[in-house]
């Protein structure tokens, strides 16, 4: 038995889960929020009960030390020596990393080099890695990249039709995100379908406040909706998804905004929030739409319509599809969105059961048994993928 910590460090937060492997039992989980403030919030789950403490946590290193001390004081571990490995979520691995990797000084340097591709996320991920290195210097640590799974995309999928030297000089290409989630749910789908993943053509719909679709053929990502950044693809909670690039100078001209200000609008004030004018939260929009709010209904239709189109295009790309998977907050819980997305896909062999579609937050087939294309709801589990990669790469167990 080994104990593995899965870590997701944000600029002012630190999410954690402690697994016992190989059983994949979650021993505890929690989050440190508002790091850098006097009223930081430390939340940990012990024996199913959430315990919360508000205290000053000046930086990530202090948050890590506090986390480890709490694991001991709550009797979850007896000493730091019981931690056998640590897995860190890293948002962007660029082209350098096509798999998770053991963290060395050289690897850390390479993660820093690709940070300009994810300036909001990678620096925070690096801070988390260094904080753990300070407190647990001899424990093997693994970086698990959101982008790595999509590194199997062929050139015709990842290249933009721009001057080729923009790719060779500046690394401008599609990278894709949510890779750890897409990998988990497609592997799990193969298990539930009882077929080798090498034989399957799968479309994975990771639908949360950020959303992306992936075409996965033979267990490998061959295309995905997000691009150079997570702004591309389908409309999302606050992100626009794909737009005509000529709109950016046009909006600048009409509003007097700078390029950065327009980008801020595209990232934070667009998507379902922009169309509805009321919220980026799907639950609010479903409620408002049910009460007759036309723009809330329109926001839901636009969101579903874009996903629907990606499913059709990826089915064409793979010359057919064996299963469609819904995952993440919206994908796992919203029967309304799933119904809107699946509506009209009977022409390609998708027959789904409205009664089965009422499922929320648990694994289920929502297609009829006779449906040639199966439809599954699979709750994602990025943390367990991180723990598995630590065991695999650090030769633990």
UniProtKB/Swiss-Prot annotation:
The record marks 178, 239 as: Transition state stabilizer. It is found in: Cytoplasm. Mg(2+). Can also accept Mn(2+). The active site is at 146 (proton donor/acceptor). CDD domains: ASKHA_NBD_AcK_PK. ATP binds at residues 15, 206-210, 281-283, 329-333. One of its GO terms (cellular component) is cytoplasm. Pathway: Metabolic intermediate biosynthesis; acetyl-CoA biosynthesis; acetyl-CoA from acetate: step 1/2. Pfam families: Acetate_kinase. Substrate binds at residue 89. Coiled coil: none annotated. Its EC number is 2.7.2.1. Catalyzes the formation of acetyl phosphate from acetate and ATP. Can also catalyze the reverse reaction. Homodimer. This is Acetate kinase. It comes from Geobacillus sp. (strain WCH70). The gene is ackA.
């Amino acid at each position: 038995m080994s104990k593995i910590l899965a870590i997701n460090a944000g600029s002012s937060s630190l999410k954690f889960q402690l697994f016992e492997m190989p059983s994949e039992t979650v021993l505890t989980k929690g989050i440190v929020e508002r790091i850098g403030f006097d009223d930081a919030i430390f939340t940990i789950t012990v024996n199913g009960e959430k315990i919360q403490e508000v205290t000053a946590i000046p930086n990530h290193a202090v948050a890590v030390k506090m986390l480890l001390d709490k694991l001991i004081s709550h009797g979850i571990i007896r000493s730091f020596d019981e931690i056998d490995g640590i897995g860190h979520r890293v948002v962007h691995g660029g082209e350098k990393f096509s798999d998770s990797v053991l963290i060395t000084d050289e690897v850390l340097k390479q993660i820093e080099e690709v940070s300009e591709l994810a300036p909001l996320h990678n620096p925070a991920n690096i801070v988390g890695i260094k904080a753990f290195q300070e407190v647990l210097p001899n424990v093997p640590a693994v970086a698990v990249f959101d982008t790595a799974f999509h590194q199997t995309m062929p050139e015709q999928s990842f290249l933009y039709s721009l001057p080729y030297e923009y790719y060779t000089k500046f690394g401008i290409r599609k990278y894709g995100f949510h890779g750890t989630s897409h990998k988990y749910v497609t592997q799990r789908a193969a298990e539930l379908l009882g077929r080798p993943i090498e034989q399957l053509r799968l479309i994975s719909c990771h639908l949360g406040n950020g959303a992306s679709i992936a075409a996965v053929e033979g267990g490998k990502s061959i295309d995905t909706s997000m691009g150079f950044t997570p702004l591309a693809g389908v409309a999302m909670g606050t992100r626009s998804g794909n737009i005509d690039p000529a709109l950016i100078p046009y909006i600048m001209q009409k509003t007097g905004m700078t390029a950065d200000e327009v980008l801020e609008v595209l990232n934070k004030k667009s998507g379902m929030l922009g169309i509805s004018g009321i919220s980026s939260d799907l639950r609010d929009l479903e409620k408002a739409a049910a009460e007759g709010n036309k723009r809330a209904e329109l926001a839901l239709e636009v969101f579903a319509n874009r996903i629907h189109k990606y499913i059709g295009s990826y089915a064409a790309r793979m010359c057919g599809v064996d299963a469609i998977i819904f995952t993440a907050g919206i994908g796992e819980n919203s029967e309304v969105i799933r119904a809107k997305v699946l509506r009209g896909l009977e022409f390609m062999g998708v027959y789904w059961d409205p009664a089965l579609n009422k499922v929320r937050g648990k694994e289920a087939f929502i297609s009829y048994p006779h449906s040639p294309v199966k439809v599954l709801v699979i709750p994602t589990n990025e943390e367990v993928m991180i723990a598995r990669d630590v065991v695999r790469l650090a030769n633990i167990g």
